[in-house]
Each structure stands twice: as C-alpha cells, then as structure tokens.
Amino acid sequence: MNLRKDKVVQSTDGDALSSKYSAVQKGYLQDEFIDLFVAGSKQAAAQQGPGSARKVVAQFQPKLPLINRGTFVRHHAIDVLVDRFLAAKKPGQRVQIISLGAGSDTRPFSLWSSKPENRDEILYHEIDFAVSVERKRDIIMQDSTLRELVGAQEYDKTTGMHTQRYHLHGIDLRSIGPGFVLPGSDPSLATLIISECCLCYLEPDQAKQVIFWITSEFTNSTIVMYEPLSGQDQFGQVMIENLASRGISIPSMTKFPSLESQIERFKAAGYTEVLATSMDVIHDEWLSPEEQQRIHGLEFLDEREELLLLLKHYCVVWASNLTK
C-alpha cells in the first residue's frame, strides 16, 4: 500500500469538487448542497495549516470555460444514465445505488430532495477512503437538512454512517474480494453501480476483482462508468505525462485505451448489454438544441476543437445485466 499515492488519489476529489463548484457558479449546473461541501473542504484545509488553506482557496478559483464545459458534459451524462435506471423501475419499487469513490458527490441528497418518494425507494451506498468518509459524515451531521435527508438520528463517531436509506462506507476498494459483503446492501434489489473516475486508479487486476465482486454479488445490476481514454494517440500520451507529473497514475488508460477495449472489458465480465461512447458525442448529440443554446450563452468558448479533442479522450460506459 502506497500512502503517498493514496493521498494523491484522495486529492483528486478536491479537483472534482472545485470544477463542479465553478460550473455551478457560472450557471452550467444546479446544486443546492455544494456550498456545504466547499465550506467543509476549506475548513478541513484550515485545520491543516496556512499552507493548505491557501492552496484550497486557490483551488476554488473560477475555471476556464473549457473546464466548465467539460464538467457540465460529464455531469449531464451521468445524470441522464441515472435517470434512465430510475425510470425503468416500477412505481413504489425499491432500488439500490452504490457509488464507488463517491468523495464529495451530492447526488444522493439531490435525489432525495427533488422527489420525497425517493427516500423510501432508493437505498444509497457511498464507498471511499476512510478519511474522505469521515469528512463527509461530519459535513452531513453538521447540517440539519442533510441529516434529515439521510435519516440520521444521532452522531455516531465510528467511521461511516448507516441509516435505513443511506450507507457511507470507509472501505479501500483494493480490499474487496470474493465473498465480500457490503454492510447494509441488498443483493435482491435492482442495483446501479456508479464509478466516476474511480476504478481507473486501480491496477487492472484490482479493478477486475471489484467488477467480479459486483457481477457475483449483485446479479441484477448495471454499471455506469466514466473514465479517461488514451486513444493511443499523442494527445492521450500528453494526458498521461501531465498526470504523472502530479504523481497521478491511471492504469486503465493504457490497459483500456479505446471504446472497443472498454466494451470488451465488460462483456468479458459477463455483462449482456454493454454500450460505450466518448464525451464529444455526448456533447454534440445528447443535449437538446435549447440546452446547447443555453450553455453557449453562459461563456464565450473559442476553443471548440480543443474541447472536442479533450472530450474525445473521456468516455462513459453502460454495462447491464438488469432483469427485464
């Protein structure tokens, strides 16, 4: 176990949070809960000293239009696929969502807030490193709205949080193997697994083991995965080198460099329905003309070709064994 590498991976949650915060501030996205997590991130940094506090303040400065647009497309794609999963359930049916490497994601709170019936119908699990989970638990417990949404009754000082509708797990995904039982999970429920730039940080054999656990434990399941592609081209190689300069290694970019290799990856794992597309296609084809017009009006973007090249090197995969 490489503690330095773990800390680098944990720090990427701050990157994702600050990017989403910038997109929210510019009007690309709506998130009524993000300010709580930004404040929590700044508070945690302040406790580590002036250097960390200054770094976090700089991190939450507005992003370039290119980054804001890419962040919007990422969240739009995941939103569409989560909505697709939920739309397939029958009225009153209970389903389960398991988010790998959830970090500061606010999705469960938004789902429960937007539709009160979701509180009884969506069992939500979030998995991340213990240090990330403890910070998220503290943010939840310090806010009455979040406490009510998750159904928390009292402040439990143990790692994580467990209620009737929400489970926050401090688990290292590398420890998951055959026979592992996720506390509070219900394998009988239709289950959606979300991996937003999570499995990509694991070594291929470790990620394969997690996917095998999912397919064996949750036989009625769908995986929605978002991660980068190298494309086996110069741009992808530059991405890999830039990440390496920050101490970030993404093994999946080499092991699964293309859409075709990602599709084959999940077919080999036993999934019967596997679809994959790059984010440039989502940008051009998944947005309505009205939404395209709206986001074009938010900021001037003179790097359309650069944006599409960047988006081409990220993908979303839908792999399903859901019972019809």
From Swiss-Prot:
Disulfide links within the chain: none
Record field: catalytic activity: [phosphatase 2A protein]-C-terminal L-leucine + S-adenosyl-L-methionine = [phosphatase 2A protein]-C-terminal L-leucine methyl ester + S-adenosyl-L-homocysteine
Keywords from the UniProt entry: Methyltransferase, S-adenosyl-L-methionine, Transferase
Broadest EC class assigned to this enzyme: transferase
The enzyme's E.C. designation: 2.1.1.233
Residues that coordinate or bind S-adenosyl-L-methionine: R74, G101, D128, D172, L173, E196
Gene Ontology terms for molecular function: protein C-terminal leucine carboxyl O-methyltransferase activity
Matches recorded under SUPFAM superfamilies: S-adenosyl-L-methionine-dependent methyltransferases
Gene Ontology biological process: methylation
Cited InterPro entries: LCMT1, Ppm1/Ppm2/Tcmp, SAM-dependent_MTases_sf
Residues forming coiled coils: none
Domain of life: Eukaryota
UniProt KW S-adenosyl-L-methionine keyword: yes
Family, per entry: Belongs to the methyltransferase superfamily. LCMT family.
Function: Methylates the carboxyl group of the C-terminal leucine residue of protein phosphatase 2A catalytic subunits to form alpha-leucine ester residues.
Protein's recorded name: Leucine carboxyl methyltransferase 1
Phylogenetic lineage: Eukaryota, Fungi, Dikarya, Ascomycota, Saccharomycotina
Gene giving rise to this polypeptide: PPM1
